[in-house]
Regions:
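Extracytoplasmic ligand/sensor domains, especially the bilobed periplasmic-binding protein
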Residues: 1-82, 130-159
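Periplasmic-binding protein-like
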Residues: 1-2, 50-56, 104-114, 120, ...
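Structural motif
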Residues: 34-37, 84-100, 165-169
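Sec-exported extracytoplasmic/periplasmic mature domains
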Residues: 40-47, 70-78, 98-105, 122-129, ...
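Residue-level detector of beta-propeller blades
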Residues: 80, 260-261
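Hydrophobic alpha-helical
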Residues: 91-95, 101-127, 197, 253
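Extracellular/periplasmic periplasmic-binding protein-like sensory domains
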Residues: 121-192, 205
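Segments of small-molecule ligand-sensing domains
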Residues: 174, 178-188, 199-260
Length: 261
């Protein structure tokens, strides 16, 4: 609220549910965007006719993606043959996966986070379910929570593609800067892009010769970001819609042989 009152530009790197105001932007996708894209992918790329859904109750992220997927599925003629849910803290998904296996869907959309996704996929394979598992960007790092065999063919929507040259360079620079061996998850490049977008806005205001801190300067920063047309970041190119949500490519990551491609 204070940022809105003062006109300071804010870019939220990773909250798809934050309230958007005239001077507040997102660097990440909103939940409906991901759910719709995955329904499209199921039908257009996987030729799926039936789907099951597995989501977390009481979780805005999970329910948001689930609702968007189901709505788009209805529009596309993708039949939802089973819907299963779990509560925060649950770890045993045998019952839900047994039900899903019995429904025999072509795909299972599981808009949940990687740890629970790994448990669910492992339980599904044990129950005899061979459907393709699909997730949102919360699936990132799922390969650390289930076997390569169980994950084979699973796909998820991501804000960036790990294999691109720009991402590879970012990962190497990140590991060197913080003296770590682990590859950063999606939140690091999103935070980097958020800072980059702010810098581009500031640069535009400076080039106009405006005085920092004035209302004209603040508005120039906002206008520069709002009017971006394909500005390149680590996670993709940025333009913004009327609600200050990013219009950027969606990367579909597939788990193959234990690797993300």
């Amino acid at each position: 609220a204070s940022a809105t009152a003062t006109g300071v530009t804010v870019i939220d790197p990773a909250d798809p549910e934050s309230e958007i105001r005239p001077n507040v932007f997102r660097a990440c996708f909103i939940d409906p965007y991901q759910g719709e894209k995955m329904a499209n992918y199921a039908v257009e790329k996987l030729s799926a006719k039936t789907a099951a859904v597995f989501y977390q109750t009481g979780n805005d992220y999970s329910e948001g993606l689930m609702n968007a997927f189901v709505a788009k599925a209805a529009e596309l003629g993708l039949e939802i043959v089973d819907t299963e849910a779990f509560a925060e803290g649950d770890k045993d998904f045998k019952a839900q996966m047994t039900n899903i296996a019995a429904a025999d869907p072509d795909v299972v959309f599981a808009p949940i986070y990687y740890a629970e996704a790994g448990l669910a996929i492992t339980a599904a394979r044990a129950a005899g379910c061979d459907a393709v598992f699909m997730g949102g960007d919360g699936f990132g790092s799922v390969k650390n929570y289930a076997s390569a065999e169980d994950l084979e063919g699973s796909v998820y929507c991501s804000g960036y593609a790990p294999g691109t040259d720009s991402v590879k360079q970012f990962e190497e620079d990140y590991k060197a800067a913080y003296n770590v061996d682990e590859i950063p998850n999606m939140f690091a490049p999103l935070a980097y892009d958020a800072a980059m977008l702010i810098c581009e806005g500031l640069k535009a205001a400076e080039e106009q010769g405006l005085t920092a801190g004035t209302e004209e300067y603040k508005q120039a920063v906002i206008d520069a970001i709002k009017n971006m047309n394909g500005t390149e970041g680590i996670t993709g190119s940025y333009s913004f819609d009327e609600y200050n949500n990013p219009i950027k490519p969606v990367a579909i990551i597939e788990l193959t042989g234990g690797d993300e491609v």
